[in-house]
Structures are given as C-alpha cells and as structure tokens.
C-alpha cells in the first residue's frame, strides 16, 4: 500500500470527480483530513490552491492527501475547464465569495468555479471566519447572493466566537448528497434509531442497550446516496446523532411519526430504533427509597411504533428490524417471515445478537421470498439503499 493510500469505507462518490478548491482561510489546515475523507468514499479529486492558501498549507501536504498533482497557477492544460461532478470550495473566504459574486476570474480557482457553474454543476461553498466577519451585513449579502445563484452554502454553528469549518465527515456527507441527488430511485425516507426508556421514578428508568449505531449508519448512507432523509433519534452511545427529532420514550417515537407525516408522507419508513415493548404502569412521583426491600414494578404494553405507522401511513413501505438471542439462524429467519406478515413490513432486517458482536453475518434482509445475507455493516447499508432505490424506480 502506498503511503498516501486510504481505506475505502463507502462507494457514494465512486466514479465521481470532485474539484477541491482551497483558498486562504486558516481552515485550509483541515485540507488533509477533508481530502482523505473524500477519497475514503471513492472520489477522484482535482485540486487547486490559491496563492493565499499556499501561505497556510503547502502544496506538498495537499498533494499527499489528495493523491494527485496540485494546481497552483496557470498552466497550459487548464484543468479548471475539465468539468467535475461538483466543485467544493473549502474554506471559502469572504474575498472568494466576493470574487464569485462579481464574476472575477483572476486565478485558476475562480476559473474552476465559473466553468462548473456554467456547465450546471453544483458548487458547495464552506465559509469559515470570526463571528464579527460572518455577521457583517456585507458577508450576509454575499451568502444570500450565492444561494440566489443556485450555489450551496454549508456553515457550522458559532463556537468560541468563530464559524469554524464543519468536520470533514459533515462536508463529505453534504458533498455526496449533492452529487447523488436526483438519482433514479431517490426517495423521501424517515429513519428511526437509538434506544428508548420509560421512568420508574424521577431518577430511574427501564431502558434497553441499543447504541443507535446501525440506524445512524443506515441514515448516513442513505443521505450520502441522495435520498431525502429525516431522522428520529432516541438515546445513543457516542456522537451518533443527526440533526433530527429527539425521541426519548416509546410515546415520543409515536408522536414523532405523526409529526413527520404532517410535513409530508415519506416513501419509506426505516424502523431501526429499539422501542420498548413494555413500560411501567405507573411512575412514582418521588424517588423510591433505596431502602425498599419489596419493590414491584407493574408493566403494560408500550405504544407500538410500527402499528401506529401502518395505521397513519398505510400505503408506504416499511423496513423494520428484528433482533433475537439464543436461537438458530433458521429459527431467526422463520420469525422474520412471521414478523413481516404480522406487522405488514415490506422488508425485515433480522439479526442475532452474536452477529452484532462479530460472530457470524451482520444480519439478513428478508423481503418477499428473498433472503439476502449481509456480511458487514457496509453490506447492510448498501442492501437497504438498493432495495429503497428499486422501490422508487
């Protein structure tokens, strides 16, 4: 393996050309991480640096990260005229925004933006600067002009008095979504993931051990592949939350489904959340004493998310998940088939707990008479995306 090689983790940019334009903001120091994240998803990168960018990060470092020659000035082959699938300007300084707004084309970077815009390719601008500069009315006018021209702007919330450049994973996810938007089969998808809990008293809960990882990966992959994804997020372990609807309890999950439907019916519901089957009948108004020696908790069936969705959205597709322990693979598949009939699911992702722990396949996708073995998380995500795309075609 070459020193500059990367481990491929996805194919959402496979065969896609991304022209990375690096301008002279301090966030140019993030170019190495950003370029390598693009490559991990299969992108073929062309890269152009402005003179000001070279004062912050060297072309040598950028060339190592991108695995290609860095364009740093005018040349006879004019690589900026080779139209890519998307131009990514990161960082996009205020000076750069001003040039694009005014049509200035005084270097190869601005020519790359102009050529791609003229060819109807998406332009993604990632400005980063101090809050005072960002909030200046002139900057806001420039950003509004960019959007009016049809360009896309990605910013982060204010932190430490600055609009810092978003994490490479966030930028690449948006890049993938723009490049793949409008693909045949693109659908509006609601993904539920994470655990749920229900209170016994004000400080104690009944919950489950779901980390939310699988649903997060599915939602992430669907968004990268150009689907319009809405997420409902329960409790998760680690940084696994998209910006979406927060849902702590089974009732919250049910309410979230109704909220989503009010904004427009999804084409597909992906139910990867671990929703409690049972919840306490009554919650104690006060903390139960730790000295109690004869504590009993009565349980009742919790609201069933899948039944609610089938009732309020009868014509849409549902992909549900089923996790089992201590049974054989054949028994798992039998239960998955029964689950599809009982719940009206169009497909079921069936898992054994030992598969989640690395012992055996990651899961099985059961739909109709078809059973697909999913050996890895990547295959699981790709399998779900392929099925959704086939429904939307």
What label would you give each PLM region?
Residues 1-393:
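A cross-family phosphate/adenosyl-ligand binding-site feature
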């Amino acid at each position: 393996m070459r020193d500059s090689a990367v481990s491929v983790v996805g194919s959402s940019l496979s065969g896609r050309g991304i022209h990375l334009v690096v301008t002279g903001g301090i966030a140019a120091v993030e170019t190495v991480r950003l370029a390598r994240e693009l490559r991990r998803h299969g992108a073929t990168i062309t890269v152009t640096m402005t003179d000001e960018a070279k004062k912050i990060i060297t072309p040598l470092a950028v060339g190592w990260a991108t695995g290609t020659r860095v364009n740093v000035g005018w040349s006879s082959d004019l690589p900026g005229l080779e139209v890519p699938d998307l131009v990514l300007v990161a960082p996009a300084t205020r000076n750069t925004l001003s040039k694009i707004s005014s049509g200035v084309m005084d270097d190869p970077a601005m020519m790359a933006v102009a050529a791609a815009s003229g060819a109807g390719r998406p332009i993604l601008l990632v400005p980063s600067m101090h809050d005072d500069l960002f909030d200046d009315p002139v900057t806001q006018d420039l950003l509004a002009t960019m959007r009016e021209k049809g360009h896309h702007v990605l910013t982060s919330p204010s932190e430490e008095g600055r609009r810092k450049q978003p994490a490479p994973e966030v930028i690449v996810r948006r890049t993938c979504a723009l490049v793949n938007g409008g693909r045949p089969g693109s659908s509006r998808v609601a993904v539920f993931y994470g655990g749920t809990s229900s209170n016994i008293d004000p400080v104690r809960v009944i919950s489950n051990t779901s980390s939310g990882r699988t649903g997060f990966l599915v939602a992430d992959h669907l968004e990268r592949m150009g689907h319009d994804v809405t997420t409902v997020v329960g409790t998760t372990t680690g940084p696994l939350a998209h910006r979406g609807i927060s849902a702590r309890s089974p009732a919250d999950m049910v309410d979230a489904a109704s909220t989503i439907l009010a904004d427009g019916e999804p084409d597909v519901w992906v139910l990867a959340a671990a929703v409690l089957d049972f919840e306490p009948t009554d919650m104690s108004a006060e903390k139960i004493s730790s000295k109690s020696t004869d504590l009993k908790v009565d349980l009742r069936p919790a609201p069933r998310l899948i039944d609610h969705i089938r009732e309020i959205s009868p014509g849409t597709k549902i992909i549900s998940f089923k996790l089992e322990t201590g049974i054989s693979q054949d028994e798992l598949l039998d239960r998955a088939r029964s689950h599809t009939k009982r719940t009206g699911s169009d497909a079921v992702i069936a898992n054994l707990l030992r598969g989640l722990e690395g012992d055996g396949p990651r899961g099985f996708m059961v739909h109709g008479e078809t059973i697909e073995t999913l050996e890895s998380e990547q295959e699981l995500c790709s399998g779900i995306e392929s099925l959704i795309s086939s429904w939307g075609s």
